[in-house]
Amino acid sequence: MSDRIAVLPQYLLPKQALTSFAGRMASARAGQLTTAVIRRFVARYGVDMSEAANPDIASYATFNDFFTRALRPGLRPLADAAVVCPVDGAVSQIGPIEQDQIFQAKGHLYSTAALLGGDAEMAAQFQDGSFATIYLSPRDYHRIHMPCDGRLVRMDHVPGALFSVNPTTARGVPGLFARNERVVCLFETPLGPMALVLVGATIVGSMATVWHGQVNPPRTGQPRRWDYGDREVVLRQGDEMGRFLLGSTVVLLFPRGAVQFMPGWEAARPVRLGEAMAHRCGI
């Protein structure tokens, strides 16, 4: 079965309603039922609870508490690199931005402007730059950390669809990451501007950042923007910057001539938070 045929049911599903329902259920305090659901999830997806700061499944009051669990201190040491991996997951795609085009999958490209909510001025900063797309599976740790030091410039919530973001859907839905709901975070870094985009998906109940809290819901259907030029929101490499309540994808954009990705960083490669991702060009 081709990927395009495999994803056809997703066009018919009431994705917004499913996501709203999943969000309510994930935040519900249902006692033993919550514990049973978490146990089932751990078994189904092979979640390694020995990595969790709190491995006691029965102690989580809600599914969201479990899903956004912290790791044991020191479990993901930071490599000595200009850019470290911001999440646990697997590389979806990685490489150069060809003018303004980002590679999604064979036969599928999308533009930086589309990803960034139609902001051509922001997109121009990444012309002929570099990108990395990392998929977080259900079993992964779902907090996002800073790949390098950065000062927050602005944050945009871009409404959109809620397709799944698994590899099959990435191959079957054109412009997937520029169609789905997303939170765009623009930072000024020692490498120049960096965009860190949190992409939503089916049953991703919400996305949150450490400086704002929960960004969505509400889902107003209208783009929202927060400017931080007059506020000092500075995060260091490795600091937590946000989290998904149910899993999804992050997309990183760097300007031209800023970074060179480490050897072996290619599609389908499993990656872990803190490992060396890229070095600064010219060093």
UniProtKB/Swiss-Prot annotation:
Keyword Manganese listed: no
Enzyme Commission number(s) from the entry: 4.1.1.65
Superkingdom: Bacteria
Keywords assigned: Cell membrane, Decarboxylase, Lipid biosynthesis, Lipid metabolism, Lyase, Membrane, Phospholipid biosynthesis, Phospholipid metabolism, Pyruvate, Zymogen
Gene Ontology MF: a single term: phosphatidylserine decarboxylase activity
Any one GO cellular component localisation term in the record: plasma membrane
Its job: Catalyzes the formation of phosphatidylethanolamine (PtdEtn) from phosphatidylserine (PtdSer).
Name of the protein in question: Phosphatidylserine decarboxylase proenzyme
